[in-house]
Swiss-Prot record:
It comes from Mus musculus (Mouse). This is DNA polymerase delta catalytic subunit. InterPro entries: DNA-dir_DNA_pol_B, DNA-dir_DNA_pol_B_CS, DNA-dir_DNA_pol_B_exonuc, DNA-dir_DNA_pol_B_multi_dom, DNA/RNA_pol_sf, DNA_pol_B_thumb, DNA_pol_palm_dom_sf, DNA_pol_type-B. Keywords: 4Fe-4S, DNA damage, DNA excision, DNA repair, DNA replication, DNA-binding, DNA-directed DNA polymerase, Exonuclease, Hydrolase, Iron, Iron-sulfur, Isopeptide bond, Metal-binding, Methylation, Nuclease, Nucleotidyltransferase, Nucleus, Transferase, Ubl conjugation, Zinc, Zinc-finger. The modification Omega-N-methylarginine is found at R19. SMART domains: POLBc. The gene is Pold1.
Amino acid sequence: MDCKRRQGPGPGVPPKRARGHLWDEDEPSPSQFEANLALLEEIEAENRLQEAEEELQLPPEGTVGGQFSTADIDPRWRRPTLRALDPSTEPLIFQQLEIDHYVGSAPPLPEGPLPSRNSVPILRAFGVTDEGFSVCCHIQGFAPYFYTPAPPGFGAEHLSELQQELNAAISRDQRGGKELSGPAVLAIELCSRESMFGYHGHGPSPFLRITLALPRLMAPARRLLEQGVRVPGLGTPSFAPYEANVDFEIRFMVDADIVGCNWLELPAGKYVRRAEKKATLCQLEVDVLWSDVISHPPEGQWQRIAPLRVLSFDIECAGRKGIFPEPERDPVIQICSLGLRWGEPEPFLRLALTLRPCAPILGAKVQSYEREEDLLQAWADFILAMDPDVITGYNIQNFDLPYLISRAQALKVDRFPFLGRVTGLRSNIRDSSFQSRQVGRRDSKVISMVGRVQMDMLQVLLREHKLRSYTLNAVSFHFLGEQKEDVQHSIITDLQNGNEQTRRRLAVYCLKDAFLPLRLLERLMVLVNNVEMARVTGVPLGYLLTRGQQVKVVSQLLRQAMRQGLLMPVVKTEGSEDYTGATVIEPLKGYYDVPIATLDFSSLYPSIMMAHNLCYTTLLRPGAAQKLGLKPDEFIKTPTGDEFVKSSVRKGLLPQILENLLSARKRAKAELAQETDPLRRQVLDGRQLALKVSANSVYGFTGAQVGKLPCLEISQSVTGFGRQMIEKTKQLVESKYTVENGYDANAKVVYGDTDSVMCRFGVSSVAEAMSLGREAANWVSSHFPSPIRLEFEKVYFPYLLISKKRYAGLLFSSRSDAHDKMDCKGLEAVRRDNCPLVANLVTSSLRRILVDRDPDGAVAHAKDVISDLLCNRIDISQLVITKELTRAAADYAGKQAHVELAERMRKRDPGSAPSLGDRVPYVIIGAAKGVAAYMKSEDPLFVLEHSLPIDTQYYLEQQLAKPLLRIFEPILGEGRAESVLLRGDHTRCKTVLTSKVGGLLAFTKRRNCCIGCRSVIDHQGAVCKFCQPRESELYQKEVSHLNALEERFSRLWTQCQRCQGSLHEDVICTSRDCPIFYMRKKVRKDLEDQERLLQRFGPPGPEAW
């Protein structure tokens, strides 16, 4: 529904045609969604049909239950019937999806120690077996701990005394909190470890390992030790903590060698099944000691993904006119759900729960309720019956789930908010805020649903893709190539209050809104990619969706450090230091009608770190090399003056991690090339991508000044080597490939950026450029230490180099006789901070220049578009600009167009006004001279409805001018480009619409003009007395214009009917992401005006008959 698309109600994907023309070709075929619903009955395997009806996981007494009876549930919706399992003879093997912990009492285990206290930390792993059974594994016996260096003179005799003192200090500190049921410190042990920060040359030193009773005691224990704890005979030394800021789950996974989403095995006889007094709704619930858990690395057969159950859902609300739905007052009228078993091609479940009767939908089960309370409880019971592992949808995190929970609370449906897998644990809503320089501030909500993974596709797209608009319609068109009907929230109430057929139409629409996120999840491989990223980095799946980047590197660092007896210190950061970034070789701007070879350093920053052994563990402090007596060939001095020992002295942790990641990626790519199974290919592709991203993020981890372990010396040394290598590559290429050395021409590096150089070898064919590019890459690589390697990547021909970070060209990579694509970097063709007209014009101009090799045609086309703009012939959908509302109006330093418009819209209609985090669509309208641009922003629909004039001069000067000059100056010359494009006859004719509201119109009187000569007439007729002889001719002309408008409107109407999947129902779509919507609105208004004009001719006279 439209009311939940508030995360960016901006304009959509740029249309295929510039200049506002109607799409005569390539019209979308009628929607097949409703027909596809009928496939449900054909996609279930025979064995599912033969299974006996299984036992429904009954809700906890007093918490859930309700209106969704077992008779309403198709047996195929439930999990497979649980087979008999004997823990004494059969192992339990499952893929874990989520790991968390709680504090409780642990039941006794075979061969395990008896619990010594009532409250102990217990880890909880939720997962799925190969047969599809849901599992909850309670893992006991693991306690939180951290390290600290032993003070000078500290011996074994001080251990008990320090433990007593620390216990007493923690007990005093925790007096105001929960009372401890036993000692806070379980043990303190002496051990030999070494800090990973810096090379000291003395090897391991004495450390204390402090084990605590509960994870929540880590913070106070660390603080008290930093302040100082009395040790008899040693005074009150201060203790520096190591690994005290590591999450309890990460600590356990590192120690147990468990990675995210891998397969766990519980050996026979080592675990106990909970048959009674289960704490969760999972089919299998077991207890096991942490040391008995076998973790399988995700390789070979253990790379597979279990048959996870994925649920996608969408809700519809009946809001009041002009007011955004509020859960305290506005009812939930429909909840539609689709279920998919991972690995199967089609959903196995389609369910529409509706308030009031609804006509049947082919291929879907429809259940109707008279009371909203019953509808809500039925969906909650359905969740427990279906038992999804992953829940997805579009904006479910900030709208659907919070609305359902809040609405149930308002209606006092007390048994509703138990949507997780833990018995009696409520699903609560918590506000969350994220802010960064890249994305600004984003407010969101977090809904606890323990045991189920939430994957909101809107949040995924916001994090991973830069789009012009993030409405479901826009992203579906961008990634899936299909549009959807978008119904305004005010119309939804009318459909609900209609009849069974209107409610059926609403249910089909709601089912489509639940179906598209599922399609996006599969098409973008979101689940597979995140599972593989969790496996590669070693963190739980949920961390990837809710946490930042650093935890992924910390996990890998801890694993590698543990094997070598190294510890990670707790570093306090200020975040004030900065360093010089990568080198950009000054571009030789111009239009190159010769092949330009691009040479690229493969994994540049990881390669530098490996080649030069750059790591925390190899860093030498100033003067340390001399103090340690290191020989000159045992350490290096980086271009920034920092020193690191070579791998012959000590192999760094980071280089080892990077080697493992890159070698694993190489293996994954080799397996991918041989694999034929589509599911295995998806997993392998996701794995190689996760390995690549993880390798590249290691450098960013060292450079993050506010982070777990920042190290300016590493990050600035990496960029220093990178700058040096780019410059050396330029020198090597230009010195070898010369006429003196027998080549056809002197090579020239025309541009270099971070990890690549663009070379002009002076040859005329792409094949020759490819050959020389490969030769040059191999020759330059021989001058750098392994594994640094320069590779031939592609050839641009022709190539338009505009400035730093801005260029375009036809890309050849695999074949020399056909280009792969037109590649643009940094140009308005790929940017989203301007109107679609700019992207379309830049793209079409580049296509004429690069593909057609017709610069004159490109100039002529640009002049035509500018003329159309000034004459008001461009469709308004092409002129819409979108900007994200990242802060409140008061927080912006200056006035912003989109912020001011949002405030005005809020005063007009608070319900439909944009909110924080939305992308605000606007156009710039004409106003008095000197009015600031931010005051001229207006809602595109408001502009259409009130015929407000567009400020075409603004679009020419502020939107089109600079992008066009950037493209054409290298071709026409700096002085000539402006005079040819922005001056001349094509800019002299302008058309300005007359506004229907505001301004001087309030003080003027409208008078009729003759349709023929435009002179003022003092009667209601159509023509003056001088044009009366031509009245029939003028009438025919206006009738012809009316017919053309009617035909255009019919074509647009039919196109919208095809999109909505019905050719006999009214079009109610209001998708602002669709250019057809604006065209339809404009033509409807033009039709009304034309009909009024024809009425001035009056009824036909007797002579007409």
